[in-house]
Amino acid sequence: MLYRLVSHIPHILFKPVYDAYESYLLEKVKSGNIPKHVAIIMDGNRRWARKLEKPPWYGHLFGSKKLEEILEWCRELNIRTLTVYAFSTENFKRSKEEVEALMNLFEEKFKELVQDERVHRYGIRVNVLGRKDMLPENVRKAAEEAERATRKYSNYNLNIALAYGGRSEIADAVREIVRDVLEGKIKPEDIDEEAIKRYLYYPNMPDPDIVIRTGGEVRISNFLLYQIAYSELFFVDVYFPEFRKIDFLRIIREFQKRQRRFGR
């Protein structure tokens, strides 16, 4: 009992300082250039669960709760588009038990989004990017219902990359372009960067200003390969469930200090 009390003393002592620094950062960020689109590779859920000697689903559950927090942070800063990498096409190679647990979690969370009054109050549109035909029918239907229920909203966009791969997205786009060329709907000489973008999973999505990867790994992992050519990349050495608002604000602040050249 005494050990538990003592172990919390540093947190109690430093919390006012921490809160003051967070408030300071928030005001600094609000006074600067706010990114329009933030994309996040939500990595480290399983390793976080393993550290706590818990099963993988436990990490994914807490990761989904962290995503809810990040949505609120984005709304507070008026970041209009958030894209998250939830499940890749390669992730289907994981154990049957983990994939099934994840699919059940996705179905549950999509249904919660439809009922969440904050989604409707703030006008958050849900878009699911990926090969939906690879998803179990119950998950696909839940995802499509979340899209239908929020289709009329335009204040904010939550893009969920599910059964997604950047190379798959480009391959699917090329396949559709070839089909339209053969059918005479588009001329080969009209194919340029913007034309290709119109064939991506969500063509109206602005390119990400920032890509954040949690979990300590320094790689892109086949995420939004066409869209992130000029994005600012940030790699954070913290598991996704432990990602803090102060980490998020520091990244936005660093983004504001960078001079983006877009290849010029």
UniProtKB/Swiss-Prot annotation:
EC number: 2.5.1.89
Residues the entry annotates as binding Mg(2+): 43, 232
Cofactor note: Binds 2 magnesium ions per subunit.
GO biological process terms held by the UniProt record: polyprenol biosynthetic process
Extent of the signal sequence: none
Active site: 43, 91 (proton acceptor)
Catalyzed reactions: geranylgeranyl diphosphate + 7 isopentenyl diphosphate = tri-trans,hepta-cis-undecaprenyl diphosphate + 7 diphosphate
UniProt: substrate binding residues: 44-48, 60, 88-90, 92, 94, 213, 219-221
Keywords: Magnesium, Metal-binding, Transferase
Cofactor(s) named in the record: Mg(2+)
GO molecular function: magnesium ion binding; prenyltransferase activity
Biological role stated in the UniProt entry: Catalyzes the sequential condensation of isopentenyl diphosphate (IPP) with geranylgeranyl diphosphate (GGPP) to yield (2Z,6Z,10Z,14Z,18Z,22Z,26Z,30E,34E,38E)-undecaprenyl diphosphate (tritrans,heptacis-UPP). It is probably the precursor of glycosyl carrier lipids.
HAMAP family: ISPT
Family of this protein: Belongs to the UPP synthase family.
Protein name (Swiss-Prot/TrEMBL): Tritrans,polycis-undecaprenyl-diphosphate synthase (geranylgeranyl-diphosphate specific)
Origin species: Thermococcus kodakarensis (strain ATCC BAA-918 / JCM 12380 / KOD1) (Pyrococcus kodakaraensis (strain KOD1))
